[in-house]
Amino acid sequence: QGASIAAAVALPGAVAAQGRPVLKAGDQKGGLRALLEAAGGLEGLGYDIQWSEFPAAAPLAEALNAAAVDSGPIGDAPLIFALAAGTRVKAIGANRSDSYGTAVLVRPDSPLKTAADLKGKSIATNRGSIGHYVTLKAITSAGLKPDEVNIRFLAPADAKLALTQGSVDAWATWEPYTALAEVSRHARVLVSGRGLLPGLSYLAATDAAIAAKRPVLQDFLQRVVKAQLWSYRNVDAYSAALARIIGIPPEAAKLQFERRQQKWVAIDAQVIADQQGTADFYRQVGLIKQPLDVKGTFDTGFGVAG
């Protein structure tokens, strides 16, 4: 815990008592805080960071909607739900990665072999998560309809337990949970998101934070970009640090990190088109009721130069 990280709750407004700005940063397990701490990316801050960790993107999106956090990492699917709910939030940076680790998992001894075998089966995942997204893409790509499977909405810890105990047939999740399940041999990948998903995630921020703390957000995004570049130059060091910070075996940390191959990219026409495709898919399967134009969900004025 560096001295630059604000451990206490910030005073009302954007500025702490000592006159330094405060960034209320949401995060997920094994996310930006772990990356920045491992890379030394929190040194020399001109502002304090008040961290809040969430078990999944959906509660993080709710926190953004409530302005409980200023910014945080969120997947393409949860961003769609946030837009549909009227959340005043925008993506300020885009990240592309290999989607293998966003996957539908089954027990090692499961008789299920393909996505088509999920017909009539129960699948645990978070509502509105990328796990929910890969579930729907997997079953529709196999010719099934959403109502031909039983989706049970559970948080990751509960979903993992349900799969292990046999109360569900499958668990749709993401990294680092997928790598951890594989390394511990508690589950195997039935269907991966590779080839099904565009592999997009974002750093999102509230409209209010963008208006009031734009230089802080730009600096924070740039630190994240630089930390990620550092991580791929120092795979072993980062994997060891990630394992220590989030409490998972080093081999699981390294597995999920190496295969994700993440890269921050500019928010361009292709990113927006891919996000529009996700929104259109959700309309197609009935999860959102109205057509959505996603262009307004992006602020293209933030740079991501390495």
Where are these regions (language model features)?
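Phosphate-coordinating loops and pocket residues in cytosolic domains that bind phosphorylated ligands
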Residues: 120, 183, 299
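Soluble non-cytosolic domains of exported or imported proteins
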Residues: 55-58, 73, 125, 129, ...
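Conserved C-terminal helix/tail region of periplasmic/extracytoplasmic solute-binding proteins
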Residues: 283-306
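Secondary-structure end/capping motifs
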Residues: 212-289
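Short, glycine-/small- and polar/acidic-enriched structural segments
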Residues: 17-145, 150-153, 169-173, 188-190, ...
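N-terminal export signals
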Residues: 1-17
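Pocket-lining segment of extracytoplasmic ligand-binding domains
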Residues: 77, 151-152, 157-244
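Solvent-exposed, polar/charged alpha-helical surfaces in well-ordered, non-transmembrane soluble domains
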Residues: 34, 62, 66, 80, ...
